[in-house]
Amino acid sequence: MHKFYVNPNQLKAELLEIEKSIPPNVPVMIHSDIMKAGFPCIEVDANIAGLAYENLFLDVFTERSIVLPTFNYDYCQSRVFNVKKDLGQVGFLSRYMVKKHSELRSKTPVFNFVILNNHDFILEPSQDAFGKGSIYEQFFSKKGVIILLGVGILQCTPLMYVEAQSNVLYRYSKKFPGMIIENDKEIYVEFSMPVRPLNPDVVEYSNILEIDLLNANIMKKFPTGFTETIICQSDEFFDFFSQKLTEDPFYPLTDNAKAAANQFCQKNGRFSLELCE
């Protein structure tokens, strides 16, 4: 037995506890680090483990749309997104999902998803990663549930959706025009997304949002395999984080980053492409 093995019945029972705790008929978005949770199969094999997790998710979240990240960050350099051939770059589960279910993949560059049990998500490309028509906008409008399996709030991309809607001072919009390829059909896209300044010391995140969400009982923890899962309803997450940003526009940053960002914005108003690149 390998050290990553976790009993699949145990894992299913733990995931069912999560399922019981969330409202009916809403989608789930699962950000995960499967290596931390464990492999519910005897073999240490990415494809076998991918299939095992796919079956677990389908068995547990039977009536829900299951939104799984398949992000391809290299689009920012290549400016080409091949929906069927560009594998996910956020762990082996993202690669497995594209290999098996590319027809279920959303068509927006960078922040794209495979959606199992897709009831009514529209997969067409969005011009803005977190804007109108994006998977994030659709997910939040459906009051979906965020599931962080073995990862923390800093790996939670819905955080960026709230920041985009709040027009935070420490991010700015940048265009990445390029090409989407699907079934040999090429589609030009004027794609944009919010980015941070190139200097990582200026915008460095603390863990305060996760701490505050847990203290407010908006986020809840569940044991899962060798790790734990944090869950949060997206509408509560949105309201809480938005309010914190209203009270303190640099709320999620470290103290040093807050001081640097505040000094920059007092002088320049906000971060922008012209000032930062």
What would you call each of these model-derived segments?
Residues 1-277:
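N-terminal and secondary-structure boundary signal
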